[in-house]
UniProtKB/Swiss-Prot annotation:
Segments annotated as Annexin repeats: 33-104, 105-176, 189-261, 265-336
Domain of life: Eukaryota
The encoding gene: Anxa2
Protein name according to UniProt: Annexin A2
Glycyl lysine isopeptide (Lys-Gly) (interchain with G-Cter in SUMO1) crosslink site(s): 49
Record's miscellaneous remark: It may cross-link plasma membrane phospholipids with actin and the cytoskeleton and be involved with exocytosis.
UniProt keyword terms in alphabetical order: Acetylation, Annexin, Basement membrane, Calcium, Calcium/phospholipid-binding, Extracellular matrix, Isopeptide bond, Phosphoprotein, Repeat, Secreted, Ubl conjugation
GO molecular function: actin filament binding; bone sialoprotein binding; calcium ion binding; calcium-dependent phospholipid binding; calcium-dependent protein binding; identical protein binding; phosphatidylinositol-4,5-bisphosphate binding; phosphatidylserine binding
């Protein structure tokens, strides 16, 4: 394994602990921040006849999440009303969804999206898979804590009652947030062993030893698995993604594919999800909003770069073509610029 590859691996999203999370975010803390002034301006905007949506969008999309929490606190102190409730009364449609998402902490937002994906008849497997496959240990542990706080039940219990079979086992294992962290020592012997076991458990035999796949893909560190998937190609005639498509079907196939794509290149994974949400006729606004809100302070700059590289046009351009009005304005602010 080349030194360059090892350095790049150490800089992967999960393992780069030296870089502040906001370094690749499009939304930065506002420099001359004044929570009281912002709260007053939002109060005035809500009271304006017809609602001054532009002011609300300008403020909330140009403040960090921590700053938005301060604004919400200042607003409640001023008006004796909760800001999310005021937003629900003042706004509607997709713009309301974006603004309410921005007012939640990242863990509250993910917890509420997970709950919504399992509420009522039918399960939104896509949302469930995206969130659980893409969050780090730390994020998942915080989501579990906040989920219990918000809904008085465990996330794991809800996943168990809403899913079944091997798909359920994979999600439950991932949701624990117990994956090994990236270490400084690279265990080439274990990399080779895991690659061989993934091959032996799938393509090499008749039927698939899914529990073996689950244990390796949910317990090993991201950096380790990146190397395992590379090594896997020396055993199998197919790469890991092709092997998954041959071996399993349905929700389980979808979950494994999402998981491997996240491990290989998380910003590219989100770039693909964003492209899929806007391609063709109609827009999958729920996916578009969730990614723009949840990644704006994490890795939006990397996502933009991968998007432009793969699709030839900027994410900003796609959003401009696919959305309109103040909803469009909000998403473009979260995007943080054209490429």
């Amino acid at each position: 394994m080349s030194t360059v590859h090892e350095i790049l691996c150490k800089l992967s999203l999960e393992g780069d602990h030296s870089t502040p999370p906001s370094a690749y975010g499009s939304v930065k803390p506002y420099t001359n921040f004044d929570a009281e002034r912002d709260a007053l301006n939002i109060e005035t905007a809500i009271k304006t006849k017809g609602v001054d949506e532009v002011t609300i969008v300008n403020i909330l999309t140009n403040r960090s999440n921590a700053q938005r929490q301060d604004i919400a606190f200042a607003y409640q102190r001023r008006t004796k009303k909760e800001l999310p409730s005021a937003m629900k009364s003042a706004l509607s449609g997709h713009l309301e969804t974006v603004m309410l998402g921005l007012l939640k902490t990242p863990a509250q937002y993910d917890a509420s999206e997970l709950k919504a994906s399992m509420k009522g008849l039918g399960t939104d497997e896509d949302s469930l898979i995206e969130i659980i496959c893409s969050r780090t240990n730390q994020e998942l542990q915080e989501i579990n804590r906040v989920y219990k706080e918000m809904y008085k039940t465990d996330l794991e219990k809800d996943i168990i009652s809403d899913t079944s079979g091997e798909f359920r086992k994979l999600l439950v294992a991932l949701a624990k947030g117990k994956r090994a962290e990236d270490g400084s020592v690279i265990d080439y012997e274990l990399i080779d062993q895991d690659a061989r076991e993934l091959y032996d458990a799938g393509v090499k035999r008749k039927g698939t030893d899914v529990p073996k796949w689950i244990s390796i893909m949910t317990e090993r560190s991201v950096c380790h698995l990146q190397k395992v998937f590379e090594r896997y190609k020396s055993y199998s005639p197919y790469d890991m993604l092709e092997s998954i498509r041959k071996e399993v079907k349905g929700d389980l196939e979808n979950a494994f594919l999402n998981l491997v794509q996240c491990i290989q290149n998380k910003p590219l994974y989100f770039a693909d999800r964003l492209y899929d949400s806007m391609k063709g006729k109609g827009t999958r606004d729920k996916v578009l909003i969730r990614i723009m809100v949840s990644r704006s302070e994490v890795d939006m700059l990397k996502i933009r770069s991968e998007f432009k590289r793969k699709y030839g046009k900027s994410l900003y351009y796609f959003i401009q073509q696919d959305t309109k009005g103040d909803y469009q304005k909000a998403l473009l602010y979260l995007c943080g610029g054209d490429d």
